[in-house]
């Protein structure tokens, strides 16, 4: 791949940060430390590239990132004038933590990742950053950290997993989640239940549908912070290896041209990222994370920007969880650049946005394959969309005065009016499914699990999967002040603001109340009189905080509401 920059370039020192330590004669102890890690005399004038991965053994999404990091370090070290230094930060496996109290730490991990990248690179004076994320919150955490530093940076996505298979049926992580509901209702044998569990995840790579990891990887490539094809190159592929080999030259180009995240992450670039989320049918979590990433670089993106773009952007990708295909299938027909090329041709993207190649988005995809709509149905043309407008809708009303996020594919309809069934937390809901408390026509209300109330705003993938598995996915709706996984589908509304513990009306809903959700007029309402609401509010007792010490308590104290991306650094 060729790298270039069309702007005017002044003479730039590649080591303008690291020279603070390596070239200062009053820093002898610092320089002794460098000799201690193996520096040679010639290394002291090189630009230092911090290479951070979220590698750890305990998650398929992340288990291979150390290997990719080593390959990237080799690429950097083979590039004249650069030296790579690896470091690591944490992650949380959403697939493992989902359904239990550990899931409260997932969103929190985004902030920990961002803070740790900023902290390490800021203290060590790295001249550039390469981040290698795998699981969901890894991606925005990496971008937020790099944006705060505002030094030449590239994100290398760890890549998507291959599908699993059992008895001739293709499987993925959501197959395992939904098998629980099938088991509860007696719709799957013990043998097949175990067979699904054993075969859903065949190895390394992020969850394979258009779930949160793949959604964000696609959004970030479109934003311009990854090399072309990074989001669609599978974890186990020659293309992913070749991508790592290119990083040395790519990061040197950014250093030479002094191209920083602030040059790339513009308002128009974020609009491109939101557009691709809609086109691919991506995760609701993109709303939270894109707002947070924009905040980190000083660009104002709000929920209403998502609605504005949703109104003019169709869903064209037939991807799981609501569709048929996985990210590996997109790779086979030309990857994300093929989609971007088509959207640019149709006038749906800002083609002049700068990217980490030093070229514009339009220049990056000039040689990409053209989508052939006659030979595949993974991606549809604009004239035959899966849904004429975006699937992510921002709903307001007395239940969500600060807004909420609905994921409406169109297959479940766009209007739901039903009877409330209230659950104070995730386990309460699962108990309700097992006891038969939920019936067709009900609106499940799961509350007290927002950013403050959770704390940490856990995902409700286990409840929505149980609902689908129990055969109620098309006849019930679910609303919450928590989040949803990218694997969630059905008639669902999350991110309700204000949340229950912050005075939101969702905290006052009672069983048998009528709730109306209108995704055409973008409203969500509790059909209870003002007098009754006032009476309930007068009698309301705020729940005792679930965390009083540690990182969860810190998050609850610092976080902004979901409508502002749950950022903690304002």
From Swiss-Prot:
Catalytic activity: (2R)-2,3-dihydroxy-3-methylbutanoate = 3-methyl-2-oxobutanoate + H2O; (2R,3R)-2,3-dihydroxy-3-methylpentanoate = (S)-3-methyl-2-oxopentanoate + H2O
Residues annotated as catalytic: 485 (proton acceptor)
SUPFAM superfamilies tied to this protein: IlvD/EDD N-terminal domain-like, LeuD/IlvD-like
Top EC class of this enzyme: lyase
GO molecular function: 2 iron, 2 sulfur cluster binding; dihydroxy-acid dehydratase activity; magnesium ion binding
Lineage top rank: taxon: Bacteria
GO biological process: isoleucine biosynthetic process; L-valine biosynthetic process
InterPro entries in the record: DHAD_IlvD/Edd, Dihydro-acid_dehy_C, DihydroxyA_deHydtase, DiOHA_6PGluconate_deHydtase_CS, ILV_EDD_C, ILV_EDD_N, IlvD/EDD_N
Residues modified as N6-carboxylysine: 137
Cofactor binding notes: Binds 1 [2Fe-2S] cluster per subunit. This cluster acts as a Lewis acid cofactor.
Pathway it works in: Amino-acid biosynthesis; L-isoleucine biosynthesis; L-isoleucine from 2-oxobutanoate: step 3/4; Amino-acid biosynthesis; L-valine biosynthesis; L-valine from pyruvate: step 3/4
Annotated binding of [2Fe-2S] cluster, by residue: 61, 135, 207
Positions of Mg(2+) binding: 94, 136-137, 459
Protein keywords: 2Fe-2S, Amino-acid biosynthesis, Branched-chain amino acid biosynthesis, Iron, Iron-sulfur, Lyase, Magnesium, Metal-binding
Cofactor(s) the protein needs: [2Fe-2S] cluster; Mg(2+)
EC number: 4.2.1.9
Family named by the database record: Belongs to the IlvD/Edd family.
Self-association and partners: Homodimer.
Main function: Functions in the biosynthesis of branched-chain amino acids. Catalyzes the dehydration of (2R,3R)-2,3-dihydroxy-3-methylpentanoate (2,3-dihydroxy-3-methylvalerate) into 2-oxo-3-methylpentanoate (2-oxo-3-methylvalerate) and of (2R)-2,3-dihydroxy-3-methylbutanoate (2,3-dihydroxyisovalerate) into 2-oxo-3-methylbutanoate (2-oxoisovalerate), the penultimate precursor to L-isoleucine and L-valine, respectively.
Name used for this protein in its record: Dihydroxy-acid dehydratase
Gene of this entry: ilvD
